[in-house]
Design a protein with these regions (language model features):
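Carbohydrate-interacting/catalytic domains
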Residues: 2-11, 15, 22-60, 65-66, ...
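Structural preference for beta-strand elements that scaffold enzyme active sites
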Residues: 56-58, 121, 189-193, 283-285, ...
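Conserved, mostly hydrophobic/aromatic
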Residues: 59, 114, 124, 163, ...
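Active-site-proximal beta-strand/loop segments in catalytic clefts of secreted hydrolases
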Residues: 60-63, 125-128, 195-199, 287-289, ...
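A generic structural signal for short coil/turn motifs at secondary-structure boundaries
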Residues: 69, 388-391
Length: 577
């Protein structure tokens, strides 16, 4: 494709809608943004959404660090104690389903640690009040078992009974939620991701005897507005005001299943989440989004956006089917981003095995096929609290991070992954075990932590890695190479990414679609001059290494420009649909 044809295609693309991803409505686009920037260069970008510059450290608050022992409430629960409830396994293995002391102060005390790794946001599990006892209903959970809640507590925060009140295990006398978000932002430049729940409350039936707070919901004044009364959902009375918040069918385990058709439910959650946004929440993560119909979320998000039109929202739709989770990204369904579960599957399959082929990672990207409203705004990850941690070597984690922080999407890293904590373990085998201050101090000398810090800072300082279009070059065996290109207004940057997941040094010979100019190694600072007399790069990348070369000038390679024009047109045609 010649240059004149490329520019013609770019001109055609100006008739497309300039809305960038309905989940945020966060950026007003210049009317000519797909054609020319400053009347000189065509604009290329995956997204203009400011949130794409974020990288997120996700932690389960109770299991991070105990910064204040006065809020542990170790004697809470009576005959159903809630503190330190171990699940013992073979060979000394252990998990725990009780509270272990992590709190806001533990997070704030280690905010510099999180910031220094290169993260810009911190996502905590839900902050809302949970019941004070271990659940005495359901099937009794044991080490290594799945989908059982008997004997567990709400240490994780997802069994809320008052969404307007912070759980007593989290704040300190001198550190409220508002204090936490303010200090995170002002002292450490860390934004706060609020984990919200709309699908369920706490375990609500099958108890030997009714327990306080279980199956109950309280309002901002502490008044009881909903109560399951330890009754099976099918026996609830919709005409009973205390039952009207709930559906009359079962949901997840014994959790109360919130009635998505009750306007009072929408009013309740709108008020609660607006309260926490006003106190400093910067973005929202939506728990179990697929368990509620699209119309519920659309109404709730529309209400929130009336007050905060630029807020970024991403949901957890636990499915490996891209077409399914992509439904949430459509404007008519609420228009949010999602956690990239298909990406998680591909990433772990590639980096858990030394014999894997890099080409197998490409299937989840969907760069320009219209599957997602905007693939560049998806939240990418390899570990979380609901599934087995990635079962990889230290080198596998290094390779995964090198990919996560250079490929399309917004990276999320789960606490402890920087030291290969509880490798391969699911929830009740240690996935959610307590990290603690000692491990954090040790982490600063860990090889994964070191390499993660390097690549996270590269992304933090590169607009191309944050928002640029991705053009793949070679993915084969243990090596991968690709471009990320951002070109808009006066900001121009191309990143050439070279990844090596083998134990040995790899040599890259790059001449395909290579623009002329002065390229700089983002980590080492070494410069490479490419001109008409030298249209070739020869780079050696260490074993389990990443090299990112940056060119801070407009694209001048006709073949690359043609590919970018074509991809830009397809991407924004999908966005405008």
């Amino acid at each position: 494709m010649n240059l004149s044809r490329a520019l013609t295609l770019t001109s055609v693309s100006t008739i497309l809608s300039l809305a960038i991803f309905g989940c945020t409505t966060s950026v007003d686009q210049p009317s000519n943004s797909f054609v020319m920037s400053n009347q000189q260069s065509p604009a290329f970008y995956g997204t203009l959404n400011p949130y794409a510059s974020e990288s997120v450290y996700f932690l389960l608050t109770d299991r991070f660090v105990d910064g204040d022992k006065t809020n542990n409430h170790e004697d809470q629960g009576g005959k159903h104690p809630s503190f330190d409830v171990p699940l013992n396994g073979p060979d000394g293995q252990q998990a725990n389903v009780g509270y272990l002391g992590g709190d806001f102060k533990g997070v704030l005390n280690n905010a510099e640690y999180i910031k220094n790794m290169g993260f810009t946001s911190v996502w905590l599990t839900p902050i809302y009040d949970n019941p004070d006892q271990a659940f005495n209903g359901g099937e009794k959970v044991a080490f290594g078992e799945y989908y059982k809640d008997g004997g567990k507590t709400g240490y994780h925060g997802y069994w809320s009974n008052n969404f307007y009140q912070v759980d007593e295990h989290l704040p300190s006398k001198d550190l409220s939620f508002a204090d936490l978000t303010k200090q995170l932002k002002e002292k450490y430049q860390l934004n706060f991701v609020l984990d919200i729940v709309g699908n369920h409350g706490s375990p609500s039936y099958s108890m030997a005897e009714d327990q306080p707070k279980f199956g109950e919901i309280y309002d901002q004044d502490g008044q009881l507005i909903a109560d399951h009364q330890n009754i099976h959902p099918e026996k609830l009375d919709p005409k009973n005001p205390l039952h009207a918040f709930y559906n009359t069918h079962t949901g997840l385990a014994q959790l109360s299943d919130i009635n998505e058709n009750n306007e009072a439910v929408l009013d309740y959650f709108e008020g609660a989440y607006l309260k926490w946004i006003a106190q400093g929440a910067h973005s929202l993560r939506v728990d179990t989004i697929k368990e509620m119909p699209h119309h519920f979320w659309k109404k709730l998000f529309d209400r929130i956006r009336q007050h905060h039109p630029e807020i970024f929202i991403f949901g957890e739709s636990y499915s490996y089917e891209a077409e399914f989770i992509a439904e949430h990204t459509r404007p008519e369904n609420g228009g949010v981003s999602v956690l990239d579960f298909p990406g998680r599957k591909a990433i772990t399959e590639v980096f858990e095995s030394a014999d894997s082929d890099f080409s197998n990672i490409l299937s989840y990207l969907h760069l320009d096929d219209g599957v997602y409203q905007n693939p560049y705004e998806l939240m990418t990850f390899y570990d979380n609290h609901d599934m087995e941690r990635m079962n990889a070597t230290d080198e596998g984690f290094i390779d995964a991070n090198n990919w996560l922080f250079t490929a399309r999407g917004i990276p999320v890293v789960y606490y402890g992954s920087e030291i290969n904590f509880m490798t391969g373990k699911p929830e009740h085998k240690g996935n959610r075990n307590y990290l603690g201050q000692q491990r954090i101090e040790q982490a600063k000398n860990h090889v994964i932590h070191h390499e993660l810090t390097n690549i996270a800072h590269v992304r933090k300082n590169s607009v191309a890695l944050q928002r640029g279009l991705q053009v793949n070059l070679d993915f084969k065996g243990d090596v991968a190479s690709f471009y990320r290109v951002y070109q808009n207004n006066d900001e121009n940057q191309t990143a050439l990414v070279l990844l090596n997941k083998s134990d040995s040094e790899a040599e890259f010979n790059i001449d395909e679609m290579l623009s002329t100019g002065l390229w700089t190694d983002a980590i080492l600072g070494k410069e490479y001059k490419i001109d008409s007399n030298n249209l070739h790069l020869n780079i050696k990348v260490k074993g389990h290494g990443a090299t990112v070369l940056l060119l801070n000038s407009p694209v001048n390679n006709a073949e690359l420009r043609a590919q970018l024009v074509a991809q830009q047109g397809k991407l924004h045609a999908a966005i405008s649909q």
